[in-house]
Amino acid sequence: MKINRLKKYYLQTIVPKLIEQFAYKNQMQVPRLEKIVINRGIGDASQNAKVLESSLKELTIIAGQKGIITRSKKAIAGFKLRQNLPVGVCVTLRGERMYSFLDRLINLALPRIRDFRGMSVESFDGQGNYSLGVEEQLMFPEIVYDKIEQITGMDISIVTSSKTNDEAHALLKEFGMPFKAKGNKN
């Protein structure tokens, strides 16, 4: 079985660096990636099934794994939403697909964003997980501009086993995530 380039880099390079940096006594204490969740909410999904289908297809192409359709849990009259109507699509990546997606995100997709200055350090949630929002799916090289129905963004949550934001920041920085400098707010 072929091991992913990023996973190999994690095992051979990142783990020893983090053991030294945080003075872990055991290799199992080193934080690791648990899963990556890609979520896309679609407001028109209840009225237009074609938008939902194309969005699910795009997310499947981006993630390399078939997504699921998320449905509303309760009715909200202000949004013209009934219970159990489709409202979005979601994919949870683990294992090799997770490392493959993170590799493509860091090395191919993020550099293609116009006026990209780095990822915000404030997007950690306090338990060592990182979330980022993407404004358009065109940053992924797998998506062909002529075949998209509608330009929509998505939320990407990177779940780690770390207990603090500092550990998760060090882990993602070692993976190559381009963070802004701490003092830089732009």
From Swiss-Prot:
Q: Which residues form the signal peptide?
A: none
Keyword terms: Chloroplast, Plastid, Ribonucleoprotein, Ribosomal protein, RNA-binding, rRNA-binding
A GO BP term here is: translation
Q: Where in the cell is it found?
A: Plastid, Chloroplast
Task: Write out the GO cellular component annotations.
Answer: chloroplast; ribonucleoprotein complex; ribosome
Q: Which GO terms describe its molecular function?
A: rRNA binding; structural constituent of ribosome
One Pfam family cited in the UniProt record for this chain: Ribosomal_L5
User: Which branch of life, at top level?
Assistant: Eukaryota
SUPFAM superfamilies in the cross-refs: RL5-like (SSF55282)
Record HAMAP family? Ribosomal_uL5_B (MF_01333_B)
Family membership: Belongs to the universal ribosomal protein uL5 family.
> How the protein assembles, per its UniProt entry?
Part of the 50S ribosomal subunit; contacts the 5S rRNA.
Known role: Binds 5S rRNA, forms part of the central protuberance of the 50S subunit.
Q: What is this protein called?
A: Large ribosomal subunit protein uL5c
Query: Which source organism does the UniProt entry give?
Result: Pleurastrum terricola
The gene for this chain is: rpl5
